């Protein structure tokens, strides 16, 4: 599946994976959502490509704070394949 992703999507996914491996263990579990914001970002980038995937991820991270109740918040389904970058 990775071969069908754009360079930008693969690069951003690698950055998120780096965060998951290096920074996240130092901070401990903080995300209020399921899936976690980093996993959400990876799925959004895979599903929608760089532009929409980044937009969805930024919106999600901005909601992840103590005043928001959190809970289940999956990546929305793809309505058609025209939104996907190749």
Curated annotation (Swiss-Prot):
NCBIfam families: membrane protein insertion efficiency factor YidD. Keywords: Cell inner membrane, Cell membrane, Membrane. Residues 67-86 are annotated as: Disordered. Belongs to the UPF0161 family. The keyword Membrane applies. This is Putative membrane protein insertion efficiency factor. HAMAP family: UPF0161_YidD. Could be involved in insertion of integral membrane proteins into the membrane. It is a peripheral membrane protein. InterPro entries: Membr_insert_effic_factor_YidD (IPR002696). It comes from the Bacteria. Its main location: membrane. It is found in: Cell inner membrane. It comes from Photorhabdus laumondii subsp. laumondii (strain DSM 15139 / CIP 105565 / TT01) (Photorhabdus luminescens subsp. laumondii). GO terms for cellular component: plasma membrane.
């Amino acid at each position: 599946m990775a071969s069908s992703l754009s360079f930008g999507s693969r690069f951003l996914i690698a950055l998120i994976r780096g965060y998951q491996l290096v920074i996240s263990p130092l901070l401990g579990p903080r995300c209020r959502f399921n899936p976690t914001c980093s996993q959400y970002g990876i799925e959004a980038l895979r599903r929608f490509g760089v532009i929409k995937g980044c937009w969805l991820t930024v919106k999600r991270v901005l909601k992840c704070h103590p005043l928001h109740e959190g809970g289940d918040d999956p990546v929305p389904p793809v309505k058609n394949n025209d939104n996907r970058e190749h």
